[in-house]
């Protein structure tokens, strides 16, 4: 990136007096061919209707860094209602921040009106204990720049002349690969504690250093995340863990003492007696997920959260077994308890929580080789996910390698051959087997020419 130096990082107290640094088209690398058609249509229609229209935020940042962003946000002086009047394919969303979503097939372009700097009670602005709960006070572009979180996210690409406007020193921070908050860090984190998670995520994604001023308050203010809605934290966790840089995000969350606020059981397990094995398991699972994301292969939150909470579930099940719980009951109770505890921090949707529960509860069943149990497990709709999780565990638990090999071979066998290989031994070969459990009169009655000596014939599998 070949950009001229900026003169100052200072953010003036009076936003309206800010004078932007303007980088003309010839001095930055943003090309319209790297901007989506939907975003360009929104920008041009707003501009042609007499409004200011800027590409803003992460898209501008990533374009300046030579990336190819997938999501595009637009900032304008048009109100949400004025934006909706220009686009039939537009819907208004949000109470905390009123936004316009313009839909082009599968692409959604988010359009936000410039935010103003208002005091509590001004217009539609509501603040409690420093946290902004609702904010629909509008202003100019200078105020909007001051209101953004990090300097590198406060760069504006002007569709009128294709220049980039920088009000807060974001260009220099891009050059220095520094993540710097706009304004007083403690105040900004109190306004929205999720900004601490964003600091970890962006530093991981971009491989930027968090500035000393921005990092200093994080560990002390991390408990503020307990007041954030669990549903919102689930959305943030997807950005952290399923965007192709999950492993590095996890490391930075842990080092900043943020992991314990969103996944407390995981953080405790990473300090527990099995921390090294559990840490390696998480490393394998997150690295695999990152590779799938980078190769545009599908990923599911259920699998990653299964890994994040595996050691807490396993440890709780072992503790309950030590208290005398029956095996299956110990695992069921452990799963229920850990999921309940996690739900107080991150609201994992039911469809994912159910998948996690099945992945965990199927793990002990891989130890069983009785024919009926094997056939039922192979036919289970969650078998493949549970098997993949078993393979993941085997990287750090060598004693599972034999199980993995056996179940891998079992999947490659026909149902008939697998059933035959698991047939119950005849009485002559297993004298200690209870005779009553060997004889299946009704099955032998239906099957002509069954083997003599009471040996059971192959079980019929649905769809065989």
Question: Where in the sequence are the language-model features?
Answer:
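Catalytic cores of the polymerase beta-like nucleotidyltransferase superfamily
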Residues: 1-464
């Amino acid at each position: 990136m070949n950009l001229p130096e900026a003169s100052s990082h200072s953010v003036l107290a009076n936003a309206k007096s800010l004078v932007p640094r303007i980088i003309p088209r010839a001095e930055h690398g943003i090309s319209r061919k790297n901007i989506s058609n939907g975003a360009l249509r929104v920008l041009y229609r707003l501009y042609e209707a007499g409004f200011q229209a800027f590409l803003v935020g992460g898209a501008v940042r990533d374009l300046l860094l030579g990336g190819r962003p997938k999501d595009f946000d637009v900032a304008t002086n048009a109100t949400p209602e004025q934006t909706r009047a220009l686009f039939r394919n537009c819907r208004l969303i949000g109470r905390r921040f009123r936004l316009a979503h313009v839909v082009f097939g599968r692409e959604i372009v988010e359009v936000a009106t410039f935010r103003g700097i208002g005091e509590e009670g001004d217009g539609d602005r509501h603040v409690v204990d420093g946290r902004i709960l609702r904010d629909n006070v509008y202003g100019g572009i200078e105020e909007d720049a001051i209101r953004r979180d990090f300097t590198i996210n406060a760069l504006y690409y002007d569709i009128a002349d294709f220049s980039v406007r920088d009000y807060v020193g974001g260009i220099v921070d891009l050059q220095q690969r520094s993540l710097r908050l706009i304004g007083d860090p403690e105040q900004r984190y109190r306004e929205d504690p999720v900004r601490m998670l964003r600091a970890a995520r962006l530093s991981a994604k971009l491989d930027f250093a968090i500035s000393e001023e921005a990092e200093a308050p994080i560990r002390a203010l991390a408990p503020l995340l307990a007041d954030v809605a669990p549903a919102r934290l689930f959305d943030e966790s997807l950005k952290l863990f399923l965007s192709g840089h999950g492993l590095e995000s996890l490391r930075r969350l842990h080092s900043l003492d943020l992991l314990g606020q969103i996944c407390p059981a995981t953080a405790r397990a990473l300090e527990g007696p099995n921390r090294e094995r559990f840490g390696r398991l998480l490393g394998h699972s997150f690295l695999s997920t990152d590779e799938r994301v980078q190769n545009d292969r599908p990923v599911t939150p259920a699998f990653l959260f299964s890994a994040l909470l595996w050691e807490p579930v396993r440890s709780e099940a072992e503790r309950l077994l030590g208290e005398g719980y029956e095996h299956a009951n110990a695992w069921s109770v452990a799963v229920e308890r850990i999921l309940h505890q996690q739900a107080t921090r991150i609201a994992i949707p039911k469809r994912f929580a159910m998948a996690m529960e099945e992945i965990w509860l199927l793990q002990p069943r891989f130890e069983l080789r009785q024919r009926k149990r094997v056939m039922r497990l192979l036919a289970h709709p969650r078998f493949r996910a549970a098997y993949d999780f078993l393979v993941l565990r085997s990287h750090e638990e060598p004693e599972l390698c034999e199980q993995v090999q056996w179940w891998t071979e079992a999947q490659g066998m026909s149902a008939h051959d697998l059933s035959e290989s698991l047939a119950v031994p005849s009485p002559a070969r297993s004298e200690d087997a209870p005779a009553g459990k060997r004889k299946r009169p009704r099955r032998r009655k239906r099957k002509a020419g069954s083997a003599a000596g009471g040996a059971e014939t192959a079980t019929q599998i649905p769809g065989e």
